[in-house]
Amino acid sequence: MVEHDKSGSKRQELRSNMRNLITLNKGKFKPTASTAEGDEDDLSFTLLDSVFDTLSDSITCVLGSTDIGAIEVQQFMKDGSRNVLASFNIQTFDDKLLSFVHFADINQLVFVFEQGDIITATYDPVSLDPAETLIEIMGTIDNGIAAAQWSYDEETLAMVTKDRNVVVLSKLFEPISEYHLEVDDLKISKHVTVGWGKKETQFRGKGARAMEREALASLKASGLVGNQLRDPTMPYMVDTGDVTALDSHEITISWRGDCDYFAVSSVEEVPDEDDETKSIKRRAFRVFSREGQLDSASEPVTGMEHQLSWKPQGSLIASIQRKTDLGEEDSVDVIFFERNGLRHGEFDTRLPLDEKVESVCWNSNSEALAVVLANRIQLWTSKNYHWYLKQELYASDISYVKWHPEKDFTLMFSDAGFINIVDFAYKMAQGPTLEPFDNGTSLVVDGRTVNITPLALANVPPPMYYRDFETPGNVLDVACSFSNEIYAAINKDVLIFAAVPSIEEMKKGKHPSIVCEFPKSEFTSEVDSLRQVAFINDSIVGVLLDTDNLSRIALLDIQDITQPTLITIVEVYDKIVLLRSDFDYNHLVYETRDGTVCQLDAEGQLMEITKFPQLVRDFRVKRVHNTSAEDDDNWSAESSELVAFGITNNGKLFANQVLLASAVTSLEITDSFLLFTTAQHNLQFVHLNSTDFKPLPLVEEGVEDERVRAIERGSILVSVIPSKSSVVLQATRGNLETIYPRIMVLAEVRKNIMAKRYKEAFIVCRTHRINLDILHDYAPELFIENLEVFINQIGRVDYLNLFISCLSEDDVTKTKYKETLYSGISKSFGMEPAPLTEMQIYMKKKMFDPKTSKVNKICDAVLNVLLSNPEYKKKYLQTIITAYASQNPQNLSAALKLISELENSEEKDSCVTYLCFLQDVNVVYKSALSLYDVSLALLVAQKSQMDPREYLPFLQELQDNEPLRRKFLIDDYLGNYEKALEHLSEIDKDGNVSEEVIDYVESHDLYKHGLALYRYDSEKQNVIYNIYAKHLSSNQMYTDAAVAYEMLGKLKEAMGAYQSAKRWREAMSIAVQKFPEEVESVAEELISSLTFEHRYVDAADIQLEYLDNVKEAVALYCKAYRYDIASLVAIKAKKDELLEEVVDPGLGEGFGIIAELLADCKGQINSQLRRLRELRAKKEENPYAFYGQETEQADDVSVAPSETSTQESFFTRYTGKTGGTAKTGASRRTAKNKRREERKRARGKKGTIYEEEYLVQSVGRLIERLNQTKPDAVRVVEGLCRRNMREQAHQIQKNFVEVLDLLKANVKEIYSISEKDRERVNENGEVYYIPEIPVPEIHDFPKSHIVDF
């Protein structure tokens, strides 16, 4: 396991040295000139160059006949058709084509010839008639051209003339710059001394370099080699830059991928630094900018040759160095330079010292470096600073090699006049993923060597490996058998078998040994080439044989691995792209170039499985069985289907013909899952329990689903080991990481639970930090029924304690461990639940019922089992204590009682210590006190951090007191005041209620409990009632106090309390009966207080009944709008004059109040309706101006903008949050600001965003007031009519009806608030909508018919 790299990467790379390069497809064709067809003797056209055309996905070739100067350009389309784009003669004979480019966007061909001509050919894309092609010479370099190269963006042409001038031209052949190459250029230095580093890396001058060369010569003369007698601070030698005999002395040009710089490599004659009278030839390269300005020159490197290639997506420049005269250290190396010309690493190509390297070239994504030799092409990849030879192509007379500019692993090269197109792909050579053979075996090709790492045995970080074996030649493909003990590798013409006796022998250090080298001639013809290899079990090997147009598969019997025999050769009649074993190694499966996947059995019988919509670069095949929740383990062949899963080059994942997902980077399968990684850095799982495949849902942010796991950026699948629930990934930098995905771990846990293997399930949960609740939650009834089995299997006390103490109330199988086995494949992934709000947490606690608690249920069941068996009780004492302490609420009293019963003091002390570990020691201390066991409390206190000076005196005092007093003191200390009162009352049980009891009741508000204690002793209960009545009066609960006083016979106090409670009938009844002399004063006091509270009818009743004051009574009835009672009282008292003196003025006053109210209401309705219409019109015309207007600023708040201020949007201004707080949910308003905001909302100041809401609410308040006034208005109308004030009555009724009609006509318009205006944002930044304000119902005014005119 390697720690994650937290540094970001500018570009996601998917290369991996754990994967091998294989040849997917190889095609070739030989272009022939149309003018020479049928007349080969007259003209001899040769293939000069070819390029990829990305616009039409075609290949453009240049054919030439140098003896007559004829040129022909042909375009070969993907469908096999051929277009002749140009055919012309050049003016010079025996010329050499240095550069050719096809500008498909402008239909132009550009040729650069060695003798100096730059020619363009512009063709007609419609007619494609070469006769209509316009040929132009754009310019000529008089002394010829040595090298030419177009930039990747096809905008700039860099050339070096034979006069050693670097010329840069634009696409329109306009000169950009010209620079003459001088020897002094090599003295330019961008080599920066940073003031640190090793001594031998620092510049010391040419004198020091000469001394080093002399030291090297002296060492050689003495016969010493290697590091013997070598000064470790001095290098063997300092390079002079001498060229080798195999250097072509050619000038080469290479552009950087971004086209900002290009490099020019050439041979220079420079003075010898040791002997200035002599000169040496030195190979060096110069770096120029796009504008042709010299940027840097390379340092001297002895043996560097002409090959040059700038890494397209990096800063390194690759070349070849041939090291000679170093004895055992002689080598041919690929060397790298930085842009400033300094060396930056190298690797040994392992080539013979006399083998010539023609060129080197990077592919478009910089993952592969092609080293081109005369008769073969080697492909190298790198990871973890190690270079691997992954593939070798064999040809003869290779003239050029080119990578496709867009398809990363498509290569084109020419040999003997043929154009060869080869497609490569990464292939993970690995063993089976089927239990129990899932050793995670990975085979890595590195030239002749096959590196083997069984990841289940050892996660060896690359480039290291566990075991290896070496073959006679470079390996083209390799495969592993079902048992992981036999390996097959193919060289150019040989099939090699290696084996180990057993995996156990490999563990002991034994490497696989080659047991058979099986030549190709033994089972096929020489025209067939060996391409791929795969196993059927351990007994049969399939070898993919290739010819130019067809593929065949040779099946070999290897039961005697030392003598393989040919079973049959299966004719496919199409080109095979990929060959591999199926999931269970019972068949071979292959894909043809049209996307068809077929299965091949051991007898050579073929069966088509599916045809992918697109060609895939990697695939797996497995038989998938349809299962359901009801019939989980039963399946048959009829309910299954062979399914092929494949990834295309553009990352599409298919299950047969169904597109499952896009942006997929790697895949693997197990017996239960399809696993794949994505470009979004996720590892996803698909259950293989149904053949009904559908597109997978998108993975959104915040997903919490067992089928999705985040992984390190750019990681890909290397292997899956189901028996260990592990997945091995490789990060972009090359390190391996073993992870244990939750879905695989949970699958194992669930399987163990259902099989009642609780200990295995527990160990897995404990190892992988899975919540132990799942042991119960996944099958609750099964768990309870087998609880004793569970306890016996677990066996260990600490494991049981861990299980019980970690229990929670949540059902984890419905939350974080929700099973997805039978969830629909297209169903959205589960999302992380929002955190509970404070209110939700509060309500959850409030609604908690211990009777239905899951934790309590499990703890009770455990206690029942353990307490029923004496052996269990003795062995699992700590577990019993844990169960008591884990109950909700915790039952510490029962745990402490159990501990107090222990006879062994050491065991008791140990149990107390353990209980204090489980719970807060202060809580345990108080629980011990609640048992009234002072010695146990002392034992607990000693485990705490309490000061002994505090608890020892207290405990001593308790010990010294008698039992009842001790219990009282303990309960008083613990705050159990009711129990303390009980103990206190028991102390003086036979006497009267003591002052101590009274004081304790008063100090702790225990009146009701005191009344309950003395329920059967009325005398003592009355004492409590007396102090309770005083307490009620002091708390303004006058009615209850008055009743209590009346019960006790304290009528004076009762009458006063009734007066305070405004209970005038009760107060007057006591006054009349017991205190007649105080009737008048009590009545006047009541009238005053009732009048103050607008209870005019009650006050009038007292005036009339107890003071006989008719006039005042009539006036009070009129104030209450009870004109009918006022008239009745006046007439009944035979005081008709009061009708005119009191009733009529009262009617007039009532008329004035009602009339004024109606006028105000009508004016308010009209004005507010008008303002509402203005606001809504303004909002509709310009919403931003409406919502974005400035809100009121406090006088003491600066409104000047600052760099840190946050601009409010019209959305957040209405919700009271800034853009930042609305997004993060973090409210930065202080409580003071919030209160200010609420006050502004309530005021609804004109011009603010709160005005509309305020106006609507104001109309609502008006309607409520009208409804309240309506009964009074009816009484006023009736009273006016009875007193013949018909005009006033008519006016009141008419105005009231008009106001109500006005409201009815406009109430819906007033209350129509838009959804946008109801939008709010809560404290968590979530948008919500306040409820719509219901439109109030306007009821009709009950009209009087006599004034309804």
From Swiss-Prot:
Residues 919-1349 are annotated as: Mediates dimerization. Its main location: cytoplasm. Phosphorylation promotes the tRNA modification function of the elongator complex. The modification Phosphoserine is found at residues 529, 539, 551, 636, 828, 1198, 1202, 1205, 1209. Changing residue 636 to A: Does not affect elongator complex activity. Residues 1228-1246 are annotated as: Required for binding to tRNA. Residues 1214-1228 have a biased composition (Low complexity). The keyword Cytoplasm applies. InterPro entries: A-sol_ELP1, Elp1, ELP1_b-prop_2, ELP1_N_b-prop_1, HB_ELP1, TPR_ELP1. Pathway: tRNA modification; 5-methoxycarbonylmethyl-2-thiouridine-tRNA biosynthesis. Disruption phenotype: Loss of mcm5U (5-methoxycarbonylmethyl uridine) and ncm5U (5-carbamoylmethyl uridine) from tRNA. Component of the elongator complex which is required for multiple tRNA modifications, including mcm5U (5-methoxycarbonylmethyl uridine), mcm5s2U (5-methoxycarbonylmethyl-2-thiouridine), and ncm5U (5-carbamoylmethyl uridine). The elongator complex catalyzes formation of carboxymethyluridine in the wobble base at position 34 in tRNAs. Functions as a gamma-toxin target (TOT); disruption of the complex confers resistance to Kluyveromyces lactis toxin zymocin (pGKL1 killer toxin). May also be involved in sensitivity to Pichia inositovora toxin. Homodimer; dimerization promotes ELP1/IKI3 stability and elongator complex formation. Component of the elongator complex which consists of ELP1/IKI3, ELP2, ELP3, ELP4, ELP5/IKI1 and ELP6. The elongator complex is composed of two copies of the Elp123 subcomplex (composed of ELP1/IKI3, ELP2 and ELP3) and two copies of the Elp456 subcomplex (composed of ELP4, ELP5/IKI1 and ELP6). The Elp123 subcomplex forms a two-lobed scaffold, which binds the Elp456 subcomplex asymmetrically. In the complex, ELP1/IKI3 interacts with ELP2. In each lobe, ELP2 is tightly sandwiched between ELP1/IKI3 and ELP3. Belongs to the ELP1/IKA1 family. This is Elongator complex protein 1. It comes from Saccharomyces cerevisiae (strain ATCC 204508 / S288c) (Baker's yeast). The gene is IKI3.
